[in-house]
UniProtKB/Swiss-Prot annotation:
Pathway membership, UniProt: Protein modification; protein ubiquitination
Zinc finger boundaries on the chain: RING-type: 627-667
Disulphide linkage map: none
A Pfam match: BRE1
The gene coding this protein: brl2
GO molecular function: histone H2B C-terminal K residue ubiquitin ligase activity; ubiquitin protein ligase activity; zinc ion binding
This protein's GO CC annotations: HULC complex; nucleus
Region of interest (Disordered), residue spans: 206-233
Name of this protein: E3 ubiquitin-protein ligase brl2
Subcellular location(s) of the protein: Nucleus
Job of this protein: E3 ubiquitin-protein ligase which belongs to the histone H2B ubiquitin ligase complex (HULC) which mediates monoubiquitination of histone H2B to form H2BK123ub1. H2BK123ub1 gives a specific tag for epigenetic transcriptional activation and is also a prerequisite for H3K4me and H3K79me formation.
Length: 680
């Protein structure tokens, strides 16, 4: 808050803002017109007084009703005992005697009730009858009390009166609080603006040298003389603004209290209107209930007719159900006699067909296995035949090679053989070899022909066997297929017939189920209609009972209407008193208007003298709040904490960057950490 025993920058700024707020309030006071305020005060004071008188009348009325109710509650057992003693064993004709009402005179607290009953004896007799019925009945005496309607309405009135009283207490508390606030505001000490000016001057004024301080002290005397006059003018303006604030607060509190009272009075008016509407609606409700009673009679007649129709439908449905049950029994007998053997034959044929199919499948598997074996044997023989052909080809190549070798040897022998013996030997050998070759060729060819013939004959035998077996299998297959087709056709026909029979049976069962459901529904409808009939009879009886009871309520409401008319007459009398009060208030308002005119004259004088000085001070304050280094272009937003002098951010930043870190006013050195930001 304070640095070196002097105020900190935020405190100075707060003081400046307080000064600006005071000036704005002064301008608002000058713009307000007193005539409008006086008009509002007059109107609202009149409304407030009217509502206060209305509330007092309502409170008195409520107190009277509560007294009557309290007396009735406290004395009703003794009253009932007296009535029961007087009227025991008497008929209704004796009730019309005037001696009956003498009982009420025994109780002085029931004078109000006695006056109300004397005007209409039939109503009193009905009330007495109901009281006697409550004495005789053992249970539910409170619900049959003839004064229940009145007690309910009075309870509602008491609740609303309590709420109105609470609202009035709240308004009075608010008025007390506003008065206490006004007294506290008036007693508060007025802080003059000279203190704030001193704080600002101290924050702006150089504090380094003693010479400058002495120069400022000499100028202080002159400034203080000027400021004393301005302070006196400002105190007067503040007093005027406070007076106007007090008036505004009082007016607002008055307006709020008047609004609350208006709402409460409107609620009471609504209650009265609702009571009057209730009287008008009773007859309409009776007419509506009579029409509903006629509608109930028509409904009962309609239900009786519907019961007859339903009984007729039940008889028809029972007849149809009997016919359907007989048809279903006949159908079951025909089905068992005609279709059952056919189904058994079909089952037998299907089993035979399944066995034949199994045999055919087994034969097919055996034939396929035998054919596979024969094909494998044929392949093996073909392999053996190919091997033998390869051996023959190899032998032929060997023979050709031997012949070539013999030819070469013979040529060599012809050239080289010298001796004849050798030649003869060679010739003998060649002839022998040629003979052996021819015999071997013949033998080989014979073996080859025999093997080919044997293999060919065996192959043809196998083919003939396979063709014969194939023809037999095909004949069997075609026969089985024909038999299966015929059996399938028969099975299809039988299945179609069976489906048709199932559909007929399902339809019969569905129709039987629907008939049963319809019978159940008709029985439920009969039970409902019987319950509706019983309820309608009960409603008709209750309606008659209510009709008889509502007659008494209508009579009570008529009494209330007469009472409300008396209440309105009393309110009209109170209006005359309020008019006299209004005349007194108008005279007081004239006196206040004269006082307001005098205040306005003083206000104008203060305005003429105080505006010029305040404008000059504003200029000086603005000059003080601007930076002197940059020729008052920017606002001061930084302060050097060592000396307390303020400058703009740009000027101090330039000095820090250029290392000229001395205050331009006092020349004291500072660092970057000594600079403190402020907000003006």
């Amino acid at each position: 808050m304070y640095q070196n025993g002097k105020p900190d920058a935020p405190t100075i700024l707060g003081q400046k803002r307080e000064l600006e707020d005071v000036e704005i309030q002064d301008d608002d006071i000058q713009e307000v017109s007193k005539e409008d305020l006086l008009k509002d005060v007059r109107v609202r004071s009149i409304q407030f007084d009217e509502l206060e008188s209305k509330i007092e009348g309502l409170q008195n009325l409520a107190e009277e009703k509560l007294k009557v109710l309290a007396t009735l509650v406290s004395w009703w057992p003794e009253i009932l005992q007296q009535f029961s003693v007087v009227f025991q064993g008497n008929e209704l004709k004796d009730f019309e005697s005037e001696g009956v009402f003498s009982i009420l005179e025994k109780f002085p607290e029931l004078s109000y009730f006695n006056d109300a009953v004397k005007n209409n004896k039939t109503k009193a007799l009905s009330i007495i009858q109901k009281l006697l019925s409550t004495v005789d009945s053992s249970t539910n005496s409170v619900s049959r009390d003839p004064f229940s309607v009145l007690s309910i309405d009075d309870s509602a009135l008491t609740e609303k009166l309590n709420t109105i009283n609470l609202d009035i207490d709240k308004i009075l508390d608010e008025l007390d609080t506003t008065r206490s606030q006004l007294h506290s505001i008036i007693k508060l000490p007025d802080r003059s603006s000279s203190f704030t000016l001193q704080c600002i001057n101290e924050s702006v004024r150089p504090q380094s040298t003693k010479v400058k301080e002495e120069a400022t002290t000499s100028s202080k005397g002159k400034d203080e003389e000027k400021k004393v006059s301005t302070v006196e003018q400002r105190t007067q303006l503040q007093q005027l603004s406070r007076l106007q604030d007090q008036q505004n607060g009082l007016m607002e509190s008055r307006s709020q209290s008047l609004k609350i009272l208006d709402s409460n009075v409107n609620e009471m008016d609504k209650l009265i209107m609702e009571r009057e509407n209730a009287l008008n609606n009773v007859e309409t409700t009776n007419l509506k209930k009579y029409s509903s009673f006629l509608a109930l009679k028509e409904a009962v007649s309609m239900t009786s007719e519907q019961l007859r129709v339903l009984e007729h439908l039940l008889s028809e449905c029972s007849h149809e159900i009997n016919v359907l049950s007989q048809q279903s029994k006949n159908f079951n007998g025909v089905f068992e006699s005609s279709y059952q053997p056919l189904i058994n034959d079909l089952d037998h044929q299907i089993s035979v067909m399944q066995n034949d199919e199994k045999r055919i499948n087994n034969a097919k598997t055996e034939l396929s296995l035998s054919l596979e074996k024969k094909l494998e044997a044929k392949k093996q023989k073909e392999k053996v035949y190919k091997d033998k052909l390869d051996e023959l080809a190899n032998l032929e190549t060997m023979v050709l090679e031997k012949k070539k070798a013999v030819a070469t040897r013979e040529a060599a022998n012809k050239i080289r053989l010298v001796d004849l013996n050798d030649l003869e030997l060679q010739k003998d050998l060649s002839t022998y070899l040629s003979k052996e070759l021819a015999s071997t060729e013949k033998a080989f060819r014979l073996v080859k022909q025999q093997t080919v013939k044997s293999s060919h004959s065996h192959y043809q035998e196998l083919i003939t066997k396979f063709s014969v077996e194939k023809e037999k299998a095909e004949q069997k297959y075609f026969l089985t297929m024909k038999s299966t087709d015929s059996l399938h056709a028969e099975v299809k026909l039988l299945r179609q017939k069976y489906q048709k029979t199932n559909e007929i049976i399902s339809k019969m069962l569905n129709s039987q189920d629907t008939a049963v459901h319809r019978i159940i529904e008709f029985e439920d409808q009969l039970a409902r209609l019987s319950s509706v009939r019983n309820n309608s009879i009960k409603q008709s009886t209750t309606f008659q009972v209510k009709k008889s009871s509502q007659k008494s309520t209508i009579q009570n409401l008529e009494e209330k209407v007469s009472y409300l008319q008396q209440f309105m007459d009393k309110n009209n009398a109170t209006l005359t008193d309020l008019e006299f009060q209004c005349s007194d208030l108008s005279s007081s308002i004239d006196i206040l208007s004269k006082q307001d005119e005098e205040h306005e004259k003083e206000k104008r004088k203060l305005k003429d003298t105080g505006v010029s000085t305040s404008a000059e001070e504003l200029k000086t304050f603005r000059a003080m709040c601007k930076c002197s280094v940059c020729n008052f272009e920017r606002w001061k937003d930084r302060i050097i904490s060592l000396c307390g002098h303020g400058f703009c951010y740009q000027c101090i930043q330039k000095r820090i960057e250029t290392r000229q870190r001395r205050c331009p006013i006092c020349g004291r050195g500072f660092g970057a950490s000594d600079v403190i930001p402020i907000h003006l």
